[in-house]
Regions:
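Divalent metal-coordination and catalytic microenvironments
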Residues: 34, 56, 66, 81, ...
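Conserved beta-strand hairpin/beta-sheet module of binuclear metal-dependent hydrolase folds
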Residues: 30-77, 165-178
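Metallo-beta-lactamase
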Residues: 22-31, 61-62, 69-70, 116-227, ...
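Active-site metal-binding motif and surrounding structural segment of the metallo-beta-lactamase
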Residues: 59-61, 72-116
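Structural recognition of the beta-strand scaffold that forms the well-ordered cores
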Residues: 37-39, 55, 63-65, 90-94, ...
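Sec-dependent N-terminal signal peptides
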Residues: 4-13
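Accessory terminal helices/loops
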Residues: 14-25, 197-248
Length: 248
């Protein structure tokens, strides 16, 4: 009887993980190989906005790149990963200090998950009296976790003064977070902490350093069109030329 109850519980978790609809608060999509994109949602000024993030399954455990924007999904994400892959999350990187990226640092740190930011992000969180990561890393750091290697890199200011990208050279996956706008974006979105003039320089650095990406994951909206980095550069150039306005 106890074994049957365990099976029923496991199937319930699986159903919650895989039975996703477009209305699910947590949506997980397979990208390629051991890479998965997950999407959560947040009510921003009366509009429900999606946020994309990434996780990587390794032999040692799962690595998260950014936390859910919806704090009610912090634990369901861990549960879904456990049900789908039978692995624990062991590391979490925040790609800048905004809530849609760093909001889960404290939750995951309390779970015993190693959390990481660069120094600039740590300083911003400290100044705002917000919870910080356990580990502070340099602006260009390469990690090997299990069978995978990835590079965490700060290209310069852009959407935020501390935005980083993550590059997986073997698979040619570029995780851009909010540094890269969706190819369907009409403007640059929130610019409260942005440096749009420097953003153009930073994009060109990324284009030069990480050539021929096969997958590019944007911070919001549709991420499947890999012209997103070029499109972001186009939006930035239009903004700097005074030909485009944006939200504040």
């Amino acid at each position: 009887m106890r074994k049957l109850a365990s099976i029923i519980l496991f199937l319930a978790i699986l159903s919650n993980s895989f039975g996703q609809s477009k209305n699910s608060p947590l949506q997980i999509s397979h990208l390629t190989g051991d890479f998965y994109v997950y999407k959560t949602f947040h009510d921003y000024k009366g509009n429900l906005i999606s946020a994309n993030a990434l996780y990587l399954v390794t032999d040692k455990g799962v690595v998260l790149f950014d936390a859910p924007w919806d704090q009610t999904q912090f634990q369901p994400l861990l549960d879904s990963i456990k049900a789908r892959h039978d692995k624990e999350v062991i590391m979490c990187f925040a790609t800048h200090s905004h809530d849609d990226r760093a909001g889960g640092l404290n939750f995951y740190r309390k779970k015993g998950i190693k959390t990481y930011t660069i120094k600039a992000t740590d300083q911003i969180l400290k100044e705002k009296n917000e919870k910080r990561a356990e580990f502070v890393i340099s602006n260009d750091t390469t990690f090997t976790v299990g069978q995978h290697t990835f590079q965490v890199y700060y290209p310069g200011k852009g959407h935020a003064p501390d935005n980083i990208v993550v590059w997986f050279d073997k698979e040619k996956v570029l995780y851009g977070g909010c540094f890269i706008k969706s190819a369907e974006a009409k403007d640059l979105g929130y610019l409260g902490d942005a440096d749009v003039k420097e953003w153009e320089k930073s994009i060109k650095i990324v284009q030069s350093k990480f050539e021929n990406p096969q997958y590019i994951i944007t911070g919001h909206d549709d991420w499947k069109d890999i012209t997103s980095l070029k499109h972001t550069l186009h939006l930035v150039q239009k903004y700097n030329a005074g030909k485009i306005s944006t939200k504040k």
